[in-house]
Regions:
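Short, surface-exposed ligand-recognition loops at beta-strand->loop->(often short) alpha-helix junctions
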Residues: 33-36
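Vicinal oxygen chelate
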Residues: 2-31, 41-136, 143-150
Length: 150
């Protein structure tokens, strides 16, 4: 078969990018940079009931994709060469995560039991039931739900 016909046949068999792209939903997934990725995966499982969807690497140096009841996020060890720093390296945070759940009191208590530190307790404020913890890796999580409209 001539080379030109062969390349046309290959292109015909290749999946259409348009078909693949139309099946992808637009989402935003935070990527947490920290120190101790392996320990972080275990913490998020214990604290929030996260499930591990993907992991590359072993020990404490990992890249992982996790899900908390369908809400996905990524984590990895900091990599200064890519300008990704942990809160510990920065001396602070640049983003807070809001975890919206049906029972913020239970999830908050579970996170604290797993090793998170309370920043402020779960209370009712601004039409939300909301509390805030900082995880052992320096990331702040607001755990809450909107109040029901009566």
């Amino acid at each position: 078969m001539p080379a030109s016909k062969k390349s046309r046949n290959i292109r015909k068999r290749a999946p259409s990018r348009r078909k693949v792209a139309s099946k992808i939903a637009t989402t935003i997934a935070p990527w947490l940079c920290l120190r101790g990725g392996g320990r972080a995966v275990e913490f998020y499982k214990a604290a929030f009931g996260a499930t591990e969807l993907f992991r590359m690497g072993d020990g404490d140096s990992v890249v992982a994709r996790l899900s908390i009841q369908g809400a996905e996020f990524w984590l990895s060890d900091e990599s200064p060469e890519h300008h990704n720093f942990s809160p510990e390296s920065l001396g602070g945070i640049t983003v807070r995560i809001i975890l919206t759940v049906a029972d913020p009191d239970a999830v908050f208590a579970r996170a604290v039991k797993a090793g998170a530190k309370e920043v402020y307790p779960v209370t009712e404020e601004h039409d939300w039931r909301l509390g805030r913890v900082v995880d052992p890796f320096g990331h702040h999580w607001e755990i809450g739900r909107p109040m029901a409209d009566d």
